[in-house]
Amino acid sequence: AAIRGMIRETQLSVENLVQPLFLVSKETSREPVKSLPNTYRLGIRETLKEVEDSLNLGITNFILFPVVPDQYKDKFATYSHHEDNFYLKITAEIKRRFPETCLISDVAMDPYSTDGHDGLVRDGKIINDETLPILAKMAVAQAAAGFDLLGPSDMMDGRVGYMRQAL
């Protein structure tokens, strides 16, 4: 029902709005995003409060973006599908407390990779096909955490089909 309400034709309402949330791994945090006025990187408590406040306004759709600390980054984006990933834990907690939400993920390596690219890099080149299994693991982990929609924002060829197969 939440997805149907979000994408219904010819009627613009609060059901069509998607609230972006930028998540950090801290329990409590509200850091301003300088390039986006009135936008913040939120800790766990602030994220849950923001979701609750938005629901009270009728906003049920959220796209969640992780802001990953450098210590969790590596060239294979291993933390992206790790069971201790704060992004996945916050998602599960949102769905537990607010099951009526529609949560949209960001499937991409760049928040988790040390080089900041959406794909594996070898000798200065993006390695498309070897990236696909990583994106698939990420998609499976995000679906298991409770995301309703998976949003692949990377630029890898064949990623959607590969993710669908994995799911």
Q: Which residue stretches match the model-derived regions?
A:
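N-terminal amphipathic/basic leader segments beginning at the initiator methionine
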Residues: A1-R8
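Alpha/beta enzyme core
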Residues: E9-V18, V24-L167
